[in-house]
């Protein structure tokens, strides 16, 4: 039996700490002065180094994907001064410009030759997705367009996961891993800020409308996504075994400030079949536990 409630700060994208808070915590605890790495630029989350994890009493170590929400890897860290005045470290592929409104825009995969996919409003502290929705013709909608970001996991991604699991395991903390590909309808992912020219249904409002009026389309997307995900999980497990304690399977929000995004019946018919398949595979083939973020909609 556990001896206490485990503490998770920074284990997943839904339990992270903003880079400004990480920097302030390092100062508060008198830790070594250093620039904080922005490992997840979409929310501007700061990487929690071992010294801070120790003083905060954090019980988990994170394994995060090789690519960020904007589709680039965190390689060759370089300094960047944020619009809110904090100097941080970002990937060499973190490419931004300030537009005519004073907003900071960021580019998918670090490619400034394509339209930006994220915007940090002037005075803001994190990025919002820029919706890049082509006109929708219901007669030509193809579920494969909403599956562009899902595919067989690459050798590079498997190698990254294996390396990061080894690093996290060496900390002695519980290993919480994000492999990707198992989030069904996560609205943060629908606009695809990591793709240069996303196709399919990418507008946030249009996606939620589609869960009502284009439900067959959504089922086709989820069904194929689930097939791909299960194959990828099998390959990941073959590479790392049961070295992971918890897998963050999905960040899809079902809660609002006042209620839920959908009824329990809709959840059971549209989403639950796919969560059930993922969880049954994990619990049937591994010793991993699973974690599902629901945004308070328990």
Regions flagged by a language model, labelled:
Residues 1-27, 31-38, 118-298:
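Active-site loop segments of alpha/beta catalytic cores
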Residues 22, 26-71:
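Segments that shape or occlude catalytic/ligand-binding pockets
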Residues 81, 88-93, 150-157:
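Extended, Lys/Arg-enriched charged tracts that mediate electrostatic binding to polyanionic substrates
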Residues 85, 89-117:
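Low-complexity, serine/threonine/proline-enriched polar segments
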């Amino acid at each position: 039996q556990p001896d206490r409630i485990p503490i998770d700060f920074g284990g997943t994208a839904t339990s992270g700490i903003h880079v400004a808070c990480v920097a302030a915590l390092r100062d508060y605890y008198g830790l070594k002065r250093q620039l904080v790495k922005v490992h997840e630029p979409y929310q501007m989350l700061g990487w929690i180094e071992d010294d801070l994890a120790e003083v905060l009493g954090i019980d988990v170590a994170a394994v995060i994907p090789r690519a960020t929400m904007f589709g680039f890897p965190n390689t060759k860290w370089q300094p960047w001064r944020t619009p809110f005045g904090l100097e941080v470290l970002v990937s060499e592929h973190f490419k931004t410009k300030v537009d005519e409104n004073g907003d900071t825009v960021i580019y998918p995969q670090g490619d400034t030759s394509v339209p930006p996919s994220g915007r940090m409003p002037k005075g803001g502290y994190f990025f919002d997705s820029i919706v890049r929705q082509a006109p929708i013709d219901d007669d030509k909608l193809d579920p494969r367009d909403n599956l562009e970001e899902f595919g067989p996991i690459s050798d590079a991604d498997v190698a990254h996961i294996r390396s990061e699991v080894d690093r996290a395991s060496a900390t002695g903390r519980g290993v919480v891993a994000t492999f990707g590909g198992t989030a069904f309808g996560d609205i943060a992912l629908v606009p695809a800020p990591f793709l240069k020219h996303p196709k399919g249904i990418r507008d946030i409002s249009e996606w939620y409308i589609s869960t009502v009026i284009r439900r067959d389309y959504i089922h086709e997307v989820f069904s194929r996504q689930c097939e791909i995900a299960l194959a990828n999980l099998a390959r990941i497990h073959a590479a790392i075994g049961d070295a992971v304690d918890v897998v963050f399977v999905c960040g899809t929000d079902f809660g609002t400030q006042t209620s839920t995004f959908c009824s329990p019946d809709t959840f059971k018919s549209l989403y639950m079949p796919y969560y059930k398949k993922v969880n049954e595979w994990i619990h049937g083939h591994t010793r991993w536990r699973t974690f599902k973020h629901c945004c308070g909609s328990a």
